[in-house]
Amino acid sequence: MRDRPHRIPRAPRLEWPGGIVPEWAKPQGGQGARKGRGGKGARGKEAGKRERLQKVMAQSGHGSRRNIEILIAQGHVTVNGHVAKLGDLVGPGDRVKLDGKLISLRFGTQLPRVLLYHKPEGEICTRDDPENRPTVFAKLPKVNNARWVSIGRLDFNTSGLLIFTTSGELANHLMHPRYEVEREYAVRLMGILTPEQVQLLTQEGVEIEGEKCRFDRLVDKGGEGSNHWYHVVLKEGKNREVRRLFEAVGLMEIGRAHV
């Protein structure tokens, strides 16, 4: 009897909450991607790789999808010498420029790279600083045909975990409030919260920039003397929101780390 060929088992199918697959996890070219028009041969393969401009720029690490859409709408992006529009399709043969500078784009099924970095105090989370302070991006390894995008930021005097990725799509998925990704901080205060202050910070909320803000969770972690530790959780982060919430109830933050 002739031996039957060995079959490789299929990988299990991923199940996403609500059946909604995020953009960064969808196939990007290759098997499973939508085929473009153009018939057989090289021309058909080339057409099949054409994708929306803002999506390709985001997955290539040139910013989050929302920021890139703003840049395109404001006329900062050109494709083959013409000002781009939202929804334009591009392929590997197109020349895309951002503010007049040719940028590299990544097509295909390559997965995004992700990097964890413990930010010490005394570093900023932007690429350029008028005061020439140290930046976290100077410490990251170089990547070819892409660049690192920071998933959130920490204050200059705050230490803790930062996540970087080469995919703007993934960064947007983790940062956008509608996905409700939790951010946890360990905060050291000068003083102890009263039950009324805890209720204000977790239920009633404090107005910041015309909007009610509150912690999703607040846990007392104890302490000694006037120094007291709390762990707080937010599902979206405004500029210095943790510090401003505690200042609103009269307590000064003297230390914080992103958990």
Locate predicted features:
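Mixed-charge, low-complexity intrinsically disordered regions
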Residues: M1-G29
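Basic, flexible Lys/Arg- and Gly-enriched helix-loop patches that mediate nucleic-acid binding at interfaces
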Residues: G19, K26, R34-R256
